[in-house]
Amino acid sequence: MQKKRVGKSVVAALAIIAMSAGTVAAWADGAPRTNDFWWPERLDLSPLRQHDVESNPYGKDFDYAQAFNKLDIEAVKKDIRATLTTSQDWWPADYGNYGPFFIRMAWHGAGTYRTYDGRGGAGGAQQRFEPLNSWPDNANLDKARRLLWPIKKKYGENISWGDLMVLTGNVALESMGFQTFGFGGGREDDWQSDLVYWGAGTKFMSNNRDKNGKLEKPLAATQMGLIYVNPEGPNGNPDPVAAAKDIRDAFGRMAMNDEETLALIAGGHTFGKAHGAASPDKCVGAAPAGAGVEAQGLGWANKCGTGKGADTITSGLEGAWSVDPVHFTMQYLDNLLEHDWVLTKSPAGAHQWMPKDAQDIVPDAHDPSKRHPLMMFTTDIALKVDPAYSAIAKRFHAHPEEFKLAFAKAWFKLTHRDLGPKARYLGKDVPKVDLIWQDPLPVAGYQMIGDADIAELKRRILASGVPKAELIKTAWASAASFRATDYRGGANGARIRLAPENDWAVNDPASLSKVLKSLEGIQSGFNRNRTDGKQVSLADLIVLGGSAAVEDAARKAGYDVKVPFSPGRVDATQAQTDVASFAVLEPTADGFRNYYQKSNERSPAELMVDRASKLDLTVPEMTVLVGGLRALDANAGHSRLGVLTNRPGTLSNDFFVNLLDMSTQWTKSSSADGTYEGRDRKTGALKWTASPVDLVFGSSSELRAVAEVYASDDAHEKFVRDFVQAWTKVMNLDRFDLKRS
């Protein structure tokens, strides 16, 4: 299981216990105060300690892919179909079908994904945990998951909650007459809440915009506790024009263009209804996280009427978009475009819209003798008044088959966006077609190089005249573009030679171009006129070059080590690389290369931890990599900051030895912002310069404890071997083929 972690520092919640029957309260006395309570500005390393294997009850040797592949997926689908139309008295199905309810569950599970940092999404099934299980926009989805518990219980380890929720959404669509695009399994479950920055607000429904009125990065939802946008309009203001702007911003940050956005909303609102039988403020109790232990994880208890069925309260909006909410039809677009809509209010007092010539034509969800008018949200009307959305809606309305395909593909993208490349997909229902957002790779049509070839290629690379530091920087830049949050980036594909990566400032484009040109020459020379069918990709050669340089640096330190290398990477084409999609992977800070853009709002050290979490690193791995890369002179821009050694290019522990040397006194530079000077305590002579990232390994008590290990006299070999191990891990982060072989 890979880690999908944070943003900003997270203060641990106070422990809670049952104080008496039916009550849950925080300890008034005896609860431990976290260090963040006393020193909120301390560097938080918890992102690097989340989702460790000890929290997984299946154990470290559990192979989810293997378990999933034993699953009879058709049997699971059959059980889901039976559940859809088996209404339960404790939570009756609208129109006798839970399909729309399960679509909302799957949508909201996947819809937290955001492109800027790759966090959120269906993977991990985080909808089960706080805060998502108690977000206002997820009201009553606790019941949807409980309805699925008998199926999860039946199949156990063979299907994760993440896969089951998405699969259920698919089956629900199919059971109501819609043809989905496919399904890929592979979402391993998490066992604790992700540490994710969801916004600065301290109250639900607070605005997620910055002081300039722009939606804060990396967020996608416009208000705290929402998946996308406020259905009543921005901050509850029923302005369709403003709502269209919010929709475009929010869905765009979730990787959807205008056509995909329109297709998703129109397709999703074809089904089901909204629930606002009465005022939530007067009727609805605490969310699951705030409910008593006797509620057993359920929340939003409704004391009005029966509290369920016709009396259900979820969003406060009330009604359906069509007269047949449990079948796929074109009625949503028919109704949106053909009616004139006027503003009204739901029984709960929420802003919504009804036809100007409203008639009671919609069947009641529970009483066949009743009928109701159609309704639309402000965000639905936005699709009619916005020129771009309106044009797409009219085109889809005129061409139903085009709409069906667009919705099918958009739904597939929504529910699979955070699963990563197609190589991670499991099951027989995976579509054969490659989609550009999956970051496709070509299939190698040649034999892989062997040990003798690898040795010869390393010899040629080291003899090429390319500086060893540049080989290391290039390999690191290529591999460290990976992020474990959505499994994008990495060395496979050699996209560092393509736009936009080849022009990223952190990659030193001018130097990078020279290295790539040299490696391409070696590649061409090796591949030319081969008769044994073997070829080497540039992607493999980039990693091999860095590894050869690391081995050379280790030899200079007196250690003969072999950096593990597994060929098999391929070279993507520019046509397989969506420039706009890859642009969000560009780092504005990389502590491993001492790179930091001053436009960042968070500190260099915080962003280093965030970067390390995206590389799935532990605290010791992050520490040894920073120290090693400094010794190898691998900073961006050829910066000398943190190169605390008189023998750069030697894989030594000098960074830690010199950082912890008490003969050096550190002060802020008076001439260079963000720079610190290390001077001899006695003479005042300048010895070193460093960044805040460098110094935090001496100032943070937890990082210093690890740094002391690597600075010790007996740690020279340990440092080298730990660095090689961590380096290899980063080089192989996107080698999903190795992890399943």
Curated annotation (Swiss-Prot):
Cofactor: how bound: Binds 1 heme b (iron(II)-protoporphyrin IX) group per dimer.
Q: Report keywords, A-Z.
A: Heme, Hydrogen peroxide, Iron, Metal-binding, Oxidoreductase, Peroxidase, Signal
Gene3D superfamilies with a match to the protein in the record: 1.10.520.10, Peroxidase, domain 2
**Tryptophyl-tyrosyl-methioninium (Trp-Tyr) (with M-254) cross-link, chain position(s):** 107-228
Q: Where does heme b bind?
A: 269
Q: Which InterPro entries match?
A: Catalase_peroxidase, Haem_peroxidase, Haem_peroxidase_sf, Peroxidases_AS, Peroxidases_heam-ligand_BS
UniProt cross-references to PROSITE patterns, sorted A to Z: PEROXIDASE_1, PEROXIDASE_2, PEROXIDASE_4
Q: Where is this cross-link: Tryptophyl-tyrosyl-methioninium (Tyr-Met) (with W-107)?
A: 228-254
Which cofactor names does the annotation list?
A: heme b
Q: Does the keyword Chaperone apply?
A: no
**Residues under site feature: Transition state stabilizer:** 104
PTM annotation, UniProt: Formation of the three residue Trp-Tyr-Met cross-link is important for the catalase, but not the peroxidase activity of the enzyme.
Q: Where is the active site?
A: 108 (proton acceptor)
Q: Which GO BP terms apply? A: cellular response to hydrogen peroxide; hydrogen peroxide catabolic process
Gene Ontology, cellular component aspect: cytosol
Q: A Pfam family matched by this chain, by name? A: peroxidase
> What does the record note on quaternary structure?
Homodimer or homotetramer.
Spell out the family assignment given in the record's similarity comment. Answer: Belongs to the peroxidase family. Peroxidase/catalase subfamily.
| Function recorded in the entry | Bifunctional enzyme with both catalase and broad-spectrum peroxidase activity.
Q: What is this protein called?
A: Catalase-peroxidase 2
Q: Which organism is it from?
A: Burkholderia ambifaria (strain ATCC BAA-244 / DSM 16087 / CCUG 44356 / LMG 19182 / AMMD)
The gene name on file is katG2
